[in-house]
Amino acid sequence: MFSFKQFSVQQDKTAMKVGTDGVLLGAWTPINHNPISILDIGAGTGLIALMLAQRTSAVQIDALEIDEEAYEQATDNFENSPWSDRLFCYHAGLDEFVEEPEDEYDLIVCNPPFYAENYKTNSEQRDLARFSDAMPFEELIEAADLLLSENGILSVIIPYKEEEKFVTLANEFELYPIKITRVKGTPTSETKRSLLVFSRNKQNCEQDILVIETDRHVYTKEYIALTKGFYLKM
């Protein structure tokens, strides 16, 4: 079990454990437009939905998970949290979910499966969770276009090397980047991840860099400020 300040995440049944990417997305995603409805696509343990339940007063926080064991785990984590009345997990793939959309969402978040590299681990479950063929970027962006409310935003974390491709695809659906944060492990390491927010409304795109640590377990003040509401030791 992974314990945060206001909730805990059981992760024994799912291949995707709590990791820096999920925590970053959950903590960084802008909420200044006061979302009432939120959708977490590919919820895994439910971590990001739980973080957004803590950060927002959204009355409807839906999560979507295709893997049965992860779905069960996310449901348990939601029920055991202080916000169980606002959280709900659907056991479905994105393609099924968008066939009959019942709601629009003010915020859609996704930590999509990646590793386009041709490599397999010994765990089929982990491969499903990590492979971009499990959820192509096109499918995610098209779904966001269908499901976002007029002033809604899409927030994702992806490998930095995929950023240009993702932005180009989003533009085809008239979704435009309004905030980009590029993430580096240390000041001298290469950029590993991109945090991106898209809107239907074109505006100046705010861009910055986030460095996680200056030395092993010596976190930058920016990273501490971002995550201190969640990590027990921050």
UniProtKB/Swiss-Prot annotation:
UniProt record, GO biological process: methylation; tRNA processing
Keyword Methyltransferase: yes
CC per GO annotation: cytoplasm
GO MF: nucleic acid binding; tRNA (adenine-N6)-methyltransferase activity
PROSITE patterns: N6_MTASE (PS00092)
EC number(s) from the headed UniProt entry: 2.1.1.223
Name of one Pfam family that matches: MTS
Cellular compartment(s): Cytoplasm
Catalytic reactions of this protein: adenosine(37) in tRNA1(Val) + S-adenosyl-L-methionine = N(6)-methyladenosine(37) in tRNA1(Val) + S-adenosyl-L-homocysteine + H(+)
UniProt keyword annotations, A-Z: Cytoplasm, Methyltransferase, S-adenosyl-L-methionine, Transferase, tRNA processing
Its job: Specifically methylates the adenine in position 37 of tRNA(1)(Val) (anticodon cmo5UAC).
The family this protein is said to belong to: Belongs to the methyltransferase superfamily. tRNA (adenine-N(6)-)-methyltransferase family.
PANTHER family named among the record's database cross-references: TRNA1(VAL) (ADENINE(37)-N6)-METHYLTRANSFERASE (PTHR47739:SF1)
Protein name: tRNA1(Val) (adenine(37)-N6)-methyltransferase
Organism taxonomic ancestry: Bacteria, Pseudomonadati, Bacteroidota, Flavobacteriia, Flavobacteriales
